[in-house]
Amino acid sequence: MPRPVLSVTAFCHRLGKRESKRSFMGNSSNSWSHASFPKLELGLGQRPSPPRESPTCSICLERLREPISLDCGHDFCIRCFSTHRIPGCELPCCPECRKICKQKKGLRSLGERMKLLPQRPLPPALQETCAVRAERLLLVRINASGGLILRMGAINRCLKHPLARDTPVCLLAVLGEQHSGKSFLLDHLLRGLPGLESGDSTRPRAEGSLPGIRWGANGLTRGIWMWSHPFLLGKEGKKVAVFLVDTGDVMSPELSRETRVKLCALTMMLSSYQILNTSQELKDTDLGYLEMFVHVAEVMGKHYGMVPIQHLDLLVRDSSHHNKSGQGHVGDILQKLSGKYPKVQELLLGKRARCYLLPAPERQWVNKGQASPGGNTEDDFSHHFRAYISDVLSTAPQHAKSRCQGYWSEGRAMARGDRRLLTGQQLAQEIKNLSGWMGKSGPSFSSPDEMAAQLHDLRKVEAAKKEFEEYVRQQDIATKRIFSALRVLPDTMRNLLSTQKDAILARHGVALLCKEREQTLEALEAELQAEAKAFMDSYTMRFCGHLAAVGGAVGAGLMGLAGGVVGAGMAAAALAAEAGMVAAGAAVGATGAAVVGGGVGAGLAATVGCMEKEEDERVQGGDREPLLQEE
């Protein structure tokens, strides 16, 4: 096939372009090929920089005009390609590589070019993060009868998120009655977290600036809710995963007292920074709930080794005392209490709680930011409210969920960084342990003191089980060897276990506090008895096996000794017949002894010796037969 002829102008133009590129970029083995596309980096980091050069035509080396692309990968202007196309050729021939290929109008799509690039898979953490959509999840549901249903799947989805699984967590929980503005507060906290996480701004963004990120307000607030996506805040190397938690209607008077106590316990486990949101004034119901919550938190903290109240904000909205400082308002509250709520007084006198007073908002500001008659929408409420949101979000990383000091002597697992800080995975395990206790069909409780008594008894029961398990393990180790096991008969071992069981029940039973002490002891005794029976079954089989092995070895030795003595006597009697025959019998007997044991060998030697003696007597008597017989 003849080569197409390039015009002099096109050839000089092309040569000049290539020579200028050589002088600027240096020699290249592929300098005559068309300019390649810029490399695309796949990832989730910064956006790729724009290409330095636009795609050029392989003929005129100019920017492509009305481009076409061939299957071989070369791109041309439609005018240049038509000029240099070989006439009479049905399929177009590429002027660059001389291959016959199909013609496509326009450049190859970006997807086709990306398929040619080496694909780098994303890290597993980023893959899981991108695959999960952030939303509000129900963690604790209250059914129609008032019972609680803990959804461990939702809890694991939140706390075992790739960004929170091995990271200290801060759970920012908003408490308060229904229709007290909790959803409004949560919505602004949620819209302020992404900007603070990215470092763009520490102020909450305007309404509608973050589509899809909104807490929302509806009537389905029964239970405890959590935003599924954590936000990483704090300095580099000390990041904390911050979650938002809505306690729903845990303060509802319609719930039973036992349900409210359990909800307080779960709220304590699912929060490290609490905000008690109330309107106008702190009412007696608010203080009563706060007293119960602090009491339950202390009980749970003592049992699980966690700090009961790490930080608590009293947020009073629509306050008529907005000109007074929060500390001054706390002083007024303490004067009114007069010893009625001792735990609340102790909390307010310390440094773990603070009070914020917010004035009533203007109606125009509440109605989606419409301007006030004076034209000033930044009223006192919005100014103080935005300042409070910024303060909460900036200090949240300082209040990650943590354990009490000195609790690590019990051998708990160590967290990353500060070993007192709980990671998301560790907190999920603690909540699972709590749900296991709450799910047991035990006596009910209607006060924090009764709950404390049950947790105390639970701790004693677990200690008794561990003590008995350790005793059984020591007995198992001590009787592993044959002769150690044979010293302790099964009946003796059964008596040892029974004595130890009775001693443990007597020692730990005295320390039980609940009224149902007898039922608890009966259940504990049944569990210990079942464990003892399981060990005795395996121990009896082991003892019988050891005894059979030792008996077989001793029996074989005794039988071999007796057979040897008898065989020696018979061989001595056979010596009177013929020394050669006896020697042969002894040799056969020795071989038999080597194969089947001393007893069988000795017996075989004696038998052969007797047979040879009888044959010798028969020959001497004249009863001789020919070696060969004829018919």
From Swiss-Prot:
The keyword Metal-binding applies. The keyword Transport does not apply. Auto-ubiquitinated. This is RING finger protein 112. GTP binds at R317, D318. Pathway: Protein modification; protein ubiquitination. E3 ubiquitin-protein ligase that plays an important role in neuronal differentiation, including neurogenesis and gliogenesis, during brain development. During embryonic development initiates neuronal differentiation by inducing cell cycle arrest at the G0/G1 phase through up-regulation of cell-cycle regulatory proteins. Plays a role not only in the fetal period during the development of the nervous system, but also in the adult brain, where it is involved in the maintenance of neural functions and protection of the nervous tissue cells from oxidative stress-induced damage. The chain crosses the membrane at residues 547-567, 580-600. Coiled coil: none annotated. PANTHER family: GUANYLATE BINDING PROTEIN. A zinc finger (RING-type) spans 57-98. GO terms for biological process: embryonic brain development; endoplasmic reticulum organization; G1 to G0 transition involved in cell differentiation; neuron differentiation; positive regulation of glial cell differentiation; positive regulation of neuron differentiation; protein autoubiquitination; protein homooligomerization.
